[in-house]
């Protein structure tokens, strides 16, 4: 997992920086600030090989936000290992196991 500054995301995905910011604004990916330099970044695992948000990620983000998770908490939830998956929810999404992850995200709100 690598935190990529927005200009690096733009370069990797062939988007301009405003389009990358729109992905964040639209809730299609989550962004976080690196603690060492406060630069806004996107975790690379949120994007598939084509540079698009991983399938089902926007729906999971919506579910977590509805459960009152902050974006930082949601990112932590997505990257914390879950023995019942196994692996992290983000890894499960990358393996096209979105239904399982969405169920867990719904349960996280209760």
Regions found by a protein language model. Name each.
Residues 1-110:
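Non-transmembrane "mature" sequence context
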């Amino acid at each position: 997992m690598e935190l990529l500054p927005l200009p690096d995301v733009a370069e990797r995905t062939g988007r301009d920086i405003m389009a990358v910011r729109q992905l964040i604004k639209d809730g299609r990916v989550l962004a976080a600030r690196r603690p060492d330099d406060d630069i806004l970044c996107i975790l690379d695992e949120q994007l598939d090989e084509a540079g698009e948000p991983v399938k089902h990620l926007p729906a999971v983000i919506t579910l977590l936000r509805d459960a009152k998770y902050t974006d930082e908490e949601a990112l932590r939830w997505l990257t914390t290992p879950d023995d019942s998956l196994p692996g992290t929810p983000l890894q499960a999404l990358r393996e096209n196991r979105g239904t399982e992850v969405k169920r867990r995200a719904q349960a996280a709100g209760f």
